[in-house]
Curated annotation (Swiss-Prot):
InterPro entries: YaaA (IPR005583). PANTHER family: PEROXIDE STRESS RESISTANCE PROTEIN YAAA (PTHR30283:SF4), PEROXIDE STRESS RESPONSE PROTEIN YAAA (PTHR30283). GO terms for biological process: response to hydroperoxide. Belongs to the UPF0246 family. The gene is yaaA. GO terms for cellular component: cytosol. This is UPF0246 protein YaaA. It comes from Escherichia coli O8 (strain IAI1). Pfam families: H2O2_YaaD (PF03883). It comes from the Bacteria.
Length: 258
C-alpha cells in the first residue's frame, strides 16, 4: 500500500531533528533542470507567477539561487520533517519512532513540483514551486508536462518493490494531477473527509487537509497494508460512512461540536 500526500508551503528548518537517518531524492537531475529555469525569473516575475508578496518572492528567488545539487544534513533536512502545513500538523512526524520512519519510508510518498516524488527521509533543500504553476521549461508549458510519466513510473517502482497494487490518494487534486492513473499499476483508493456545518456535511479545507495527515499517521502507526483496514480510522471524531462510500472513495464524517 502506497500513500500519496501533497507537500506544504510552510517549511521548518529550525526544530530539532527526531532522526539522523536520511536518503537522497531520486530525481535530482530533473530538479536541477527546473532550478535552471527558475533562476531565470526575477523576484517580480516570481511574485506574479506564484501570486505571492514581494517579500516571499525575494525569499524564493534566494532559495533558487542558493540551491545546489550536493545535499547534506548541513544544507537540507528530511522532507517529512521539513514540511509544516495542515497535512503535516495531522501527521506529526516529529513524534515518529524509528520503526515508524522505516514503515513510512516504504509506504509514504510526497509529490513535489521541484522534486517530483519524495520519500520521507529524502533530504530536501528549501523551495516553493507548486505543481500547478505554469513554469515554462524545455519539456512544455508547465510542471505537468515537465514531469510527464516520470512521477507515475517512480510510483510504479515503489509499488513493485513492496509487491503491492494499492495507492491511497491523500494528495490534493493539484498534485494528484501529476500522476497518470491509467499508467499506474494500482487500484486507487481516495479517502474523503466531510465535516458537519449547520447540519450539513461538506469538505472544509483546513479540516480535510489535517485529516489527510491523521489518516497517514493512522496507517503508519498501525502498519496497515490492506485498504479495508482504513475503515477503522476514528482519529479526532471521524467515523467511516459506508452508505456514502463507493467506487474507490471511502467517506469519513465528523459531527459538529455542540
Amino acid at each position: 500500500m502506497l500513500i500519496l500526500i501533497s507537500p506544504a508551503k510552510t517549511l521548518d528548518y529550525q526544530s530539532p531533528l527526531t532522526t539522523m537517518r536520511y536518503t537522497l531524492p531520486e530525481l535530482l537531475d530533473n530538479s536541477q533542470q527546473l532550478i535552471h529555469e527558475a533562476r531565470k525569473l526575477t523576484p517580480p516575475q516570481i511574485s506574479t507567477l506564484m501570486r505571492i508578496s514581494d517579500k516571499l518572492a525575494g525569499i524564493n528567488a534566494a532559495r533558487f539561487h542558493d540551491w545546489q545539487p550536493d545535499f547534506t544534513p548541513e544544507n537540507a533536512r528530511q522532507a517529512i520533517l521539513a514540511f509544516k502545513g495542515d497535512v503535516y500538523t495531522g501527521l506529526q512526524a516529529e513524534t515518529f519512532s524509528e520503526d515508524d520512519f522505516d514503515f513510512a519510508q516504504q509506504h509514504l510518498r510526497m509529490l513535489s513540483g521541484l522534486y517530483g516524488v519524495l520519500r520521507p527521509l529524502d533530504l530536501m533543500q528549501p523551495y516553493r514551486l507548486e505543481m500547478g504553476i505554469r513554469l515554462e521549461n524545455a519539456r512544455g508549458k508547465d510542471l505537468y508536462q515537465f514531469w510527464g510519466d516520470i512521477i507515475t513510473n517512480k510510483l510504479n517502482e515503489a509499488l513493485a518493490a513492496q509487491g503491492d497494487n494499492v495507492v491511497i490518494n491523500l494528495a490534493s487534486d493539484e498534485y494528484f494531477k501529476s500522476v497518470k492513473p491509467k499508467k499506474l499499476n494500482a487500484e486507487i483508493i481516495k479517502p474523503v473527509f466531510l465535516d458537519e456545518k449547520n447540519g450539513k456535511f461538506k469538505i472544509i479545507s483546513f479540516y480535510a487537509k489535517k485529516a489527510r495527515g491523521l489518516m497517514s499517521r493512522f496507517i503508519i502507526e498501525n502498519r496497515l497494508t490492506k485498504p479495508e483496514q482504513l475503515t477503522g480510522f476514528n482519529s479526532e471524531g471521524y467515523f467511516f460512512d459506508e452508505d456514502s462510500s463507493s467506487n474507490g472513495e471511502l467517506v469519513f464524517k465528523r459531527y459538529e461540536q455542540r
